[in-house]
C-alpha cells in the first residue's frame, strides 16, 4: 500500500512537470511569432472570425485573430497547469496526512503495548490515545515507562529480575534511541522526496547516527537537485511548508536532553516540581543548567562497593548513595535480582558491603561423612596384635574396638593417643582368691646337735621366720632345747642342746611344754649311726679333757657371771636347780592332795 502511494505520487509529479514544460514551450513560440516581421500577406479564409468593421486591413485582422487564438490556447494551458498543481498539492497533502496518521497510530500501538508490559493504568493509556503527534506519544511513553520501572523496583517483584537482566546499559540504550530516531527522521525526509527503497535500506542498515546523517545528506541533496530540475510550482510551495532541518534537530536534541535529565532526577527521587521545570525548558543549554543546579542542591553522595561471593556469581560492583542504608537497599536488590542469597557484612572504613552465599543445605541422610583410620593395639594374655577400622570419629572407633575385644575375650585397661589415632588395651591379670593362692616357698634346713637326737631335717616356708617357728616347735616336740643359730646364705638353722650336770643328783628329764600352735609337718631328722656317734664322741671327749682341766682351773679362780658372758655350765646348773625345785614343789603338792 505504501509503495503504491509513492508510485502514484511520482506519476502525478511527472505529469505536472510535463504540463509545465509544454505550457512554457507554447508561450515561448507565441512570443517568437509576434516579434517576427510579417513578410507575406496571409490569406484570410472565407468565414474568418474577424470582420473589417473598424476599417482595418485584412492582414491586421488576420494577425489579431491568430493572436486571440494563441492567447486562448495559452490561457487554457495555464489553467490546466494550475489545476494539475492544485490536484498534486492536494494529493501530496493527503498522502502526508495519511503517512502521519499511520506513524501516529503505530507509535500509539507501541506505547500501549509497552504500557501493558508494566501494567500501567488506563489513565495513562487514555493520554496516549489523545496525543496528536508522534513526538508527544514518545515523550509521554518515556516518562510513564520510567516511572513504571521505578515502581516495579520498589515492589521488588520476581518478574523485575528478568526484566532488568534484559535491559541494556544506559549508555547503550541512549545510543540505540538516538540511532533509531535518526533513522526515522532520515526515512521521513527521504519520503518527502520520493526516494526509492534502495536508499532507505541503506539508512536502516547504518550502525551509527553519524552514518545515518551522512547518507541522508547525500541522498537528500541529490533528490533536491532532481526536484529543482522539474521546476514545479507545487514543489516550491511544498518545500517552503517544511520545517527547517536545523530546527528539527534542535527539537530532537531538546527532547533527548529532557528524557536524560528526568532519568537522572529519578535516581535521586527528586519531586515532580523539578521535573516540570525540566520539561518546560526551551533549550538544551537550559536543561543542562537546570539539572546541574538541582543535582548540586542534593545531599552529597559517596561511592559504596559490593563484593559478591556467590556459588555461581563472584565479583564487585559500586553505586552512588547518600548513606550506607540506601546503598544497602540497592545492593540487596541487585543480589536478589541475580539470585544471590547469603550473609551480609559491612566495613564502614572502606564503605564495602560483602555478601557470602550460604552453602547448599543437603539432607544429612545423603551425606557421606569423612572417615579416618584408627588403630587398636591388643596386649592380652592369650591375644596380642594390631587391627584397624575406618570411622567418622574416635568415639565410633572406640565402640567398634571394644566390641572386637569383647568378642575375643579381651578385658583390660584402655588408652587412646589422638596424635596417632591409636587405641591400646592391656588385659588385666587374672584375679585369684587369696584363699586359693599358693605363696612362693623356700626350703629351709635344721641341723640338730642334741644330747640324744642329732641329725638334719628340712621344711618349706614362705620366709625364715615361719621356718624358725616350725623348727623350734619340732625341736621342742623332740625334747631338744639348746642354742639356736641361723645362716641366711644357706637357709640353715642350727640348734645345739645344752648339757646340765648337777653333782649328787640324777639328771631329770625336763617336762615337755604343750604345743601352742599347729605344727607344720617336717621331714624327720636323720639319726646318726651309733658307731660313728660313739667314735665322734670319744674323739671329742679326748680332745676336750686337757681343755676342760684348764678351764676348771680358771673357773676356780673366778666367780660365775650372768648374761651372755656366763659359762653355760653354770647356766645349766641354775636351770637344773630351778627345775628340781619345781619338781619338788609339784611332788609336795601331790602328796598333800
UniProtKB/Swiss-Prot annotation:
Motif LPXTG sorting signal per UniProt: ranges: 559-563
Residue segments, region Disordered: 503-567
Membrane topology: Peptidoglycan-anchor
Main localisation: secreted
Basic and acidic residues: compositionally biased ranges: 529-557
Spans annotated as 3 X 37 AA repeats: 104-290
InterPro entries, A to Z: GA-like, Ig/albumin-bd_sf, IgG-bd_B, LPXTG_anchor, M_anchor, YSIRK_signal_dom
Keywords for this protein: Cell wall, IgG-binding protein, Peptidoglycan-anchor, Repeat, Secreted, Signal
Signal peptide location: 1-33
Protein name: Immunoglobulin G-binding protein G
Native source species: Streptococcus sp. group G
Organism taxonomic ancestry: Bacteria, Bacillati, Bacillota, Bacilli, Lactobacillales
Amino acid at each position: 500500500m505504501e509503495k503504491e502511494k509513492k508510485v502514484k505520487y511520482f506519476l502525478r509529479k511527472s505529469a505536472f512537470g510535463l504540463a509545465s514544460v509544454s505550457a512554457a514551450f507554447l508561450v515561448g513560440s507565441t512570443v517568437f511569432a509576434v516579434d517576427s516581421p510579417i513578410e507575406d500577406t496571409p490569406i484570410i479564409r472565407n468565414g474568418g472570425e474577424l470582420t473589417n468593421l473598424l476599417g482595418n486591413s485584412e492582414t491586421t485582422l488576420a494577425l489579431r485573430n491568430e493572436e486571440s487564438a494563441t492567447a486562448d490556447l495559452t490561457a487554457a494551458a495555464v489553467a490546466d497547469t494550475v489545476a494539475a498543481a492544485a490536484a498534486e498539492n492536494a494529493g501530496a497533502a493527503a498522502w502526508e496526512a495519511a503517512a502521519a496518521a499511520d506513524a501516529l497510530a503505530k507509535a500509539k500501538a507501541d506505547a500501549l503495548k509497552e504500557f501493558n508490559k508494566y501494567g500501567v493504568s488506563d489513565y495513562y493509556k487514555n493520554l496516549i490515545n489523545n496525543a496528536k503527534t508522534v513526538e508527544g506519544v514518545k515523550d509521554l511513553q518515556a516518562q510513564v515507562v520510567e516511572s513504571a520501572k521505578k515502581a516495579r523496583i520498589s515492589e521488588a517483584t520476581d518478574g523485575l529480575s528478568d526484566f532488568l537482566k534484559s535491559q541494556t546499559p544506559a549508555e547503550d540504550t541512549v545510543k540505540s534511541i538516538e540511532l533509531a530516531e535518526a533513522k526515522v527522521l532520515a526515512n521521513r525526509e527521504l519520503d518527502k522526496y520520493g526516494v526509492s527503497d534502495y536508499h532507505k535500506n541503506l539508512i536502516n542498515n547504518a550502525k551509527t547516527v553519524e552514518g545515518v546523517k551522512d547518507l541522508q545528506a547525500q541522498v537528500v541533496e541529490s533528490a533536491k537537485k532532481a526536484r529543482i530540475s522539474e521546476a514545479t510550482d507545487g514543489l516550491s510551495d511544498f518545500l517552503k511548508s517544511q520545517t527547517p532541518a536545523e530546527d528539527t534537530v534542535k527539537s530532537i536534541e531538546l527532547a533527548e536532553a529532557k528524557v536524560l535529565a528526568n532519568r537522572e532526577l529519578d535516581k535521586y527521587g527528586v519531586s515532580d516540581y523539578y521535573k516540570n521545570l525540566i520539561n518546560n525548558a526551551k533549550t538544551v543549554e537550559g536543561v543542562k543548567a537546570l539539572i546541574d543546579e538541582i543535582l548540586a542542591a542534593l545531599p552529597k553522595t559517596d561511592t559504596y562497593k559490593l563484593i559478591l561471593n556467590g556459588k555461581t556469581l563472584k565479583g564487585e560492583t559500586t553505586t552512588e548513595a547518600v548513606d550506607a542504608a540506601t546503598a544497602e537497599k540497592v545492593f540487596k536488590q541487585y543480589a536478589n535480582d541475580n539470585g544471590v542469597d547469603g550473609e551480609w557484612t559491612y566495613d564502614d572504613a572502606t564503605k564495602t558491603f560483602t555478601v557470602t552465599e550460604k552453602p547448599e543445605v543437603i539432607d544429612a541422610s545423603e551425606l557421606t561423612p569423612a572417615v579416618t583410620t584408627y588403630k587398636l593395639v591388643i596386649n592380652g594374655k592369650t591375644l596380642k596384635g594390631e587391627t584397624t577400622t575406618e570411622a567418622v570419629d574416635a568415639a565410633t572407633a572406640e565402640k567398634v574396638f571394644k566390641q572386637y575385644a569383647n568378642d575375643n575375650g579381651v578385658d583390660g585397661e584402655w588408652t587412646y593417643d589422638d596424635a596417632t589415632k591409636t587405641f591400646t588395651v592391656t588385659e588385666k591379670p587374672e584375679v585369684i582368691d587369696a584363699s586359693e593362692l599358693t605363696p612362693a616357698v623356700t626350703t629351709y634346713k635344721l641341723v640338730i646337735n642334741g644330747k640324744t637326737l642329732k641329725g638334719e631335717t628340712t621344711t618349706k616356708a614362705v620366709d625364715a621366720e615361719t621356718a624358725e617357728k616350725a623348727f623350734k616347735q619340732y625341736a621342742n616336740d623332740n625334747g631338744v632345747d639348746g642354742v639356736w643359730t641361723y645362716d641366711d646364705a644357706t637357709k640353715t638353722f642350727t640348734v645345739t642342746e645344752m648339757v646340765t650336770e648337777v653333782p649328787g643328783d640324777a639328771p631329770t628329764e625336763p617336762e615337755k611344754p604343750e604345743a601352742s600352735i599347729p605344727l607344720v609337718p617336717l621331714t624327720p631328722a636323720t639319726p646318726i649311726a651309733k658307731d660313728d656317734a660313739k667314735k665322734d664322741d670319744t674323739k671329742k671327749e679326748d680332745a676336750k679333757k686337757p681343755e676342760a682341766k684348764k678351764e676348771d682351773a680358771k673357773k676356780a679362780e673366778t666367780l660365775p657371771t650372768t648374761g651372755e658372758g656366763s659359762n653355760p655350765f653354770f647356766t645349766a646348773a641354775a636351770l637344773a636347780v630351778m627345775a628340781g625345785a619345781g619338781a619338788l614343789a609339784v611332788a609336795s603338792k601331790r602328796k598333800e592332795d
